[in-house]
């Protein structure tokens, strides 16, 4: 026994790294696999959801960045004219840029949410259980903020591609290069402040609503796992509440992002808000396109949450085989 202890001490003195205990290795492997599952599930969820509503999203952005009055009839006319002029797939123009941004954004957001839930659960003594309301709201806000900070330039590029003719920019890299060269690198973060101000309530309320509805459902029905259509409905409610709360800041963000190609000189959040209200009014300016968002948003968020949950469940089942 004494010889074994001396051998281990001698090995440590020579700088040799002793093997980690099997339990510690297993725990680290499980944690890494959990993070990977969240990243993959989040990326897939974001891609499916955004592709499903891409034509509506593009139409909404075009109205947001112009002073033209919005109506469902005008939105339909714009979609139809685009289809006649440029073809069916032109309705998905800018979707490649959307995917470049949405896949990492959704992956980071969903993964960060799982991590923040664990951290806050441990801090508040609710590890492995549903979080209380305030930490539940905080976890969502932190997750959205983390994802927005990391992926914001991609959102800027996506907005530019959505509102410009296809002849103006040939591909995503062309947008990056030309914005950097012609307008400066700082332009890639134009509109960042209203984005963060909007993400905090949007992500917080979206995740909070979805998690709360799942918790209430489990308590009322005794089923820990809702059916897919129930997850879709919970996600749709979450999207409706989250997007309605943050919508004016979304309009401000789009105006600031596309200022370089629309002829305006929006520079600050308050200045942009004042100009929009002065020219178009509060409802027709800051809430332009909200009715379309009430269609698009719940569908996208519902699909996103449902896809994330079901993909995670599927991945866990495969790992048990």
UniProtKB/Swiss-Prot annotation:
The keyword Phosphoprotein does not apply. Solcar repeats lie at residues 33-119, 131-216, 226-314. Keywords: Membrane, Mitochondrion, Mitochondrion inner membrane, Repeat, Transmembrane, Transmembrane helix, Transport. It comes from the Eukaryota. The chain crosses the membrane at residues 35-55, 91-111, 137-154, 191-208, 232-252, 295-315. It holds the Pfam family Mito_carr. InterPro entries: GDC-like, Mit_carrier, Mitochondrial_sb/sol_carrier, Mt_carrier_dom_sf. It is a multi-pass membrane protein. The keyword Membrane applies. GO terms for cellular component: mitochondrial inner membrane; mitochondrion. It is found in: Mitochondrion inner membrane. One of its GO terms (biological process) is coenzyme A transmembrane transport. GO terms for molecular function: ADP phosphatase activity; ADP transmembrane transporter activity; AMP transmembrane transporter activity; ATP transmembrane transporter activity; coenzyme A transmembrane transporter activity. It catalyses: ADP(out) + CoA(in) = ADP(in) + CoA(out); 3'-dephospho-CoA(in) + ADP(out) = 3'-dephospho-CoA(out) + ADP(in); adenosine 3',5'-bisphosphate(in) + ADP(out) = adenosine 3',5'-bisphosphate(out) + ADP(in); AMP(in) + ADP(out) = AMP(out) + ADP(in). Disruption phenotype: Morphant embryos show morphological anomalies including dorsal curvature and bent tails, severe muscle disorganization, early motor defects, and mitochondrial abnormalities. Mitochondrial carrier mediating the transport of coenzyme A (CoA) in mitochondria in exchange for intramitochondrial (deoxy)adenine nucleotides and adenosine 3',5'-diphosphate. Belongs to the mitochondrial carrier (TC 2.A.29) family. This is Mitochondrial coenzyme A transporter SLC25A42. It comes from Danio rerio. The lineage of its organism: Eukaryota, Metazoa, Chordata, Craniata, Vertebrata.
